[in-house]
């Protein structure tokens, strides 16, 4: 049974890869990769984001100046048309995947709800 679920998951992966939103996102990444300025801004923003995430995962405090640095990098990145497009497309794709995840989790949620309703 789990093999069939994995097969369906692989089909979903292929459907995502073939979808227009994913293809647009892929093109946006390529556009950023080809633009040195946009690429450097993206790399800087991503580095800051990763450092903050690592600190958060370790339970370390994120300092106000680190938050400010991240906000400035984000604001700067959003001023670049290619990066702004990439971020918007990435957000749309994330929302779509979150919706798919909600659908996939529905059976578990129904089980939890039914358990609570029985008592």
UniProtKB/Swiss-Prot annotation:
Coiled coil: none annotated. Gene3D superfamilies: YheA/YmcA-like. Pfam families: Com_YlbF. Signal peptide: none annotated. Belongs to the UPF0342 family. This is UPF0342 protein GTNG_0551. It comes from Geobacillus thermodenitrificans (strain NG80-2).
């Amino acid at each position: 049974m789990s093999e069939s679920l994995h097969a369906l998951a692989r089909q979903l992966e292929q459907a995502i890869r073939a979808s227009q939103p994913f293809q647009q996102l892929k093109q946006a990444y390529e556009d950023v990769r080809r633009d040195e300025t946009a690429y450097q801004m993206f790399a800087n923003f991503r580095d800051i984001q990763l450092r903050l995430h690592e600190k958060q995962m370790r339970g370390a405090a994120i300092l106000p100046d680190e938050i400010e640095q991240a906000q400035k990098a984000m604001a700067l990145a959003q001023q670049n048309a290619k990066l702004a497009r990439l971020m918007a497309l990435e957000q749309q794709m994330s929302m779509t995947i979150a919706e798919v995840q909600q659908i996939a989790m529905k059976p578990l949620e129904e089980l939890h709800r039914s358990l609570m309703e029985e008592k």
